[in-house]
Design a protein with these regions (language model features):
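A short, conserved, highly charged catalytic patch centered on acidic carboxylates
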Residues: 1-126, 132-155
Length: 155
């Protein structure tokens, strides 16, 4: 397991008290958080809160370049279209995939299987999963997963 000391960051959150009607269903609008990486406001879900904290850790503490971070992009897994949470590039190639879960979702075999499916398409060297409290990571060497105790240095 990887221990993360999250940096202080002045997140911009705007409450959204309006509600919208969709057909006969009344839907309460959600608060939003400004994502400085995507440069837009996004719905503040529990998973998004984990994602934003992980992104700040990677950028501020690990010094991963902002320009080489992709967030919530679609990929094809056979006939299925899926979205990864975070992808870090190195030399224009996928280098690290990070799957974010909300705080009360355990990082388990299902999460690792999901990451490994993404890896089959993206061929990244590193795989990580976090729910904000628990973070696990692995490097792929000769087709096998090797557990990591830290995020690798960005080269």
């Amino acid at each position: 397991m990887i221990e993360i000391n999250y940096p202080q960051y002045p997140f911009k959150i705007r409450p959204n008290e309006a509600s919208t009607s969709i057909g006969k269903v009344q839907e309460q609008a959600k608060d939003q958080i400004f994502d400085p990486f995507r440069k837009k406001w996004v719905v503040l879900t529990p998973e998004e809160w984990v994602r934003q904290n992980i992104l700040q850790y990677l950028n501020q503490v690990c010094q991963y370049p902002t320009a080489l971070i992709a967030i919530e992009k679609s990929i094809q897994l056979g006939e299925l279209t899926k979205r990864f949470d975070i992808l870090i590039y190195n030399n224009d190639k996928p280098w690290m995939i990070i799957e974010c879960k909300k705080a009360n979702v355990a990082i388990n075999d299902k999460t690792i299987t999901q990451l490994y499916q993404y890896q089959q398409v993206l061929e990244a060297q590193y795989l990580f999963a976090s729910n904000g409290h628990e973070t696990v990571g692995a490097e792929i060497k000769t087709g096998k997963l090797h557990a990591l105790q830290n995020f690798p240095a960005y080269l």
